[in-house]
Amino acid sequence: MRIVIVGAGKLGYSIAELLSQEEYDIVVIDKEEKQLGNIKENLDVLTIAANGSSPITMDNPDVQGADMLIAVTGSDEVNMVCCILAKKHG
């Protein structure tokens, strides 16, 4: 199962850590390279430095085939847009 997590802050990191231990295929998206660096160093997950609320990001082949999207950015509006885009992109 492929799970996309938008937001690489504390909550996104914790979710990615837990799910990667369960052998899920995890993709973490965040605009901030610094946030992604910590995840790259410590977890066996794919990271994408991009805007999670962009249709271009949702068209990425690593994102398109996802079974689930979890949006945990610091903005409710961004989280909602991410979820709407994910639903539209399948």
Tell where the protein language model's regions lie, with residue ranges.
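Cytosolic regulatory regions of ion transport systems
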Residues: 1-90
